């Protein structure tokens, strides 16, 4: 901005000059500053010719002679003295005496001047002084406006640079957030994203959401699901357990009134594990809590007459024939019209788990022709495992 030529005073003051001129309601110039009298006499002579057509030749000649002075008068004060102008024109046409026109013009011109305040005499030095002062003022205002706009541009550029620095690639930037549960197959302890569920008491056949907690042990032979029992027509969630190849008894009770009495959040303190009742939101491969092989965790399998179907990411259904159902742990069902949620014990044929013996004592039964939901695609169904073991 220092190298460019500053604008002139007329350029800076152009709009203000226009506004000031039209707001002042400008008056016409006095008689001394009129345009040349040739135009005024030409206009007035044209008017005289119009009037002469209706008069005698002598009157018309006199009218045209008097129209010269009246023409000067009309152009001089046509704004302030419009009424006088009309009357003088009429008088010029009829009487043809220019003296009456001159008299009216003189009176009209003196009237506004005497009534107004005496104007200040404008000399050349006064005008130059005013122009110098106004030029300094306008240049100062121009510099301030340019400075403000320059500061705004500079600030916006700095903000843009800061935004680029914050969002640009760097340590911790430009990469996805590292998610827990992405290394469950590497045997590390992970924290999958889970949603904490509240205890729901089912009154009148309420079905609380089924809780599925999976545990991946470090030995591939002992993979298990935590069996979650759900209360009957008046009950809620009963018990939660983990399976890592051990035996034990589950905790939890079911009141017939629909009250849901559960143990505290720490379900596995007896086996050295701390786990909360959560719903896994990730696929089964990324979900897992690694349990040490030295810890024997209890497997709880408590099933009631009804259950809420599990909504897994990959729903898979299996048809259980009657022959395999006969080989499964049998028992009497209180309500044969409803399917059962069974505790799935995943164990290899070489090392049967003691949890199967515990599950055999439970009143569980595979119904013939009933579709049983399976938690995921990555585990073998216990009925299929039993069939292969028998073969």
Swiss-Prot record:
Keywords, alphabetical: Biological rhythms, Cytoplasm, Nucleus, Phosphoprotein, Repeat
Record's protein name: Period circadian protein
InterPro entries linked to this entry: Period_circadian_regulator
Top-level taxonomy: Eukaryota, Metazoa, Ecdysozoa, Arthropoda, Hexapoda
Quaternary data: Forms a heterodimer with timeless (TIM); the complex then translocates into the nucleus.
Annotated spans, Disordered: 27-121, 163-188, 241-270, 328-357
GO cellular component, one term: perinuclear region of cytoplasm
Single GO MF annotation: transcription corepressor binding
Amino acid composition bias (Gly residues), ranges on this chain: 93-114, 241-255
Predominant localisation class: nucleus
Claim: rRNA processing is one of the keywords in the record: no
GO biological process, one term: entrainment of circadian clock by photoperiod
General function of this protein: Essential for biological clock functions. Determines the period length of circadian and ultradian rhythms; an increase in PER dosage leads to shortened circadian rhythms and a decrease leads to lengthened circadian rhythms. Essential for the circadian rhythmicity of locomotor activity, eclosion behavior, and for the rhythmic component of the male courtship song that originates in the thoracic nervous system. The biological cycle depends on the rhythmic formation and nuclear localization of the TIM-PER complex. Light induces the degradation of TIM, which promotes elimination of PER.
Entry PTM: Phosphorylated with a circadian rhythmicity, probably by the double-time protein (dbt). Phosphorylation could be implicated in the stability of per monomer and in the formation of heterodimer per-tim.
Cell location: Nucleus; Cytoplasm, Perinuclear region
